[in-house]
């Protein structure tokens, strides 16, 4: 507020020193002072309600990340399982009873398919266990610490105290109850006087 009056005062001083006061026509606006007051009053009390981050916030992040990674493992496991079961195996041995030919590439290929089945099952189990554990952790992470409960109670008391001091207007004013606000009790003419 003082910085605004200093700048306004310095502008008037410059206008006076430059050769006289210039007359202004119209309505003066004091909106800049109103908004300065509002923002100052809002930011004065901001520090009162700051709350430190609790360890529960980190556990919340932990279970969410675990749930997402568990979901990824389940999807990856299902994909690898599908590859292991849906890709047809190759024939390893062919021939007659007395003469059998074994294809070593087919044996390795079929071994890789079996490995895919096993890896898919393991990934699916790890992902499912991770998801179940993280869902349980989310349920148990809802319990608040004593400090956080105390801060919440203190915040609620302050809000209740503020509401108790500011009482809303519940009845309409009667015919004799009307009063002019102090700021409007004196009317000051800001229009220039007409010379004619």
UniProtKB/Swiss-Prot annotation:
Main localization of the protein described in the UniProt heading: membrane
Induction record: By retinoic acid in neuroblastoma Neuro2a cells. Down-regulated following fear conditioning (at protein level).
Tissue expr: Expressed predominantly in brain. Also weakly expressed in lung and spleen. In brain, expressed strongly in nerve fibers of the cerebral cortex, anterior cerebral nuclei, hypothalamus, amygdaloid complex, brain stem of the metaencephalon and medulla oblongata, and moderately expressed in soma of neurons of the dentate gyrus of the hippocampus and Purkinje cells of the cerebellum.
Domain of life: Eukaryota
Keyword line: Cell projection, Membrane, Transmembrane, Transmembrane helix
Transmembrane segments: 67-87, 121-141
Cross-referenced InterPro entries: Neurensin
Membrane topology label: Multi-pass membrane protein
Family affiliation: Belongs to the VMP family.
Known function: May play an important role in neural organelle transport, and in transduction of nerve signals or in nerve growth. May play a role in neurite extension.
Protein name, entry field: Neurensin-1
Organism: Mus musculus
């Amino acid at each position: 507020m003082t910085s605004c009056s200093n700048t306004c005062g310095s502008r008037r001083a410059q206008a006076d020193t430059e050769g006289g006061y210039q007359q202004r026509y119209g309505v003066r606006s004091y909106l800049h002072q109103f908004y300065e007051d509002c923002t100052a009053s809002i930011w004065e009390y901001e520090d009162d309600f700051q709350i430190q981050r609790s360890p529960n916030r980190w556990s919340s992040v932990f279970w969410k990340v675990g749930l997402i990674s568990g979901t990824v493992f389940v999807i990856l496991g299902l994909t690898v399982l599908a590859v292991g079961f849906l890709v047809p195996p190759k024939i390893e041995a062919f021939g007659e009873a007395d003469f059998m030919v074994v294809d070593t590439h087919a044996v390795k290929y079929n071994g890789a398919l079996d490995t895919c089945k096993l890896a898919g099952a393991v990934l699916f189990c790890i992902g499912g266990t991770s998801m179940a554990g993280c869902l349980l952790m989310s349920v148990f992470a809802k319990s608040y610490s004593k400090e956080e409960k105390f801060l919440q109670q203190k915040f609620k008391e302050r809000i209740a105290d503020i509401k108790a001091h500011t009482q809303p207007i519940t009845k309409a004013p009667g015919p004799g109850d009307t009063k002019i606000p102090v700021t409007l009790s004196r009317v000051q003419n800001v229009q220039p006087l007409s010379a004619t």
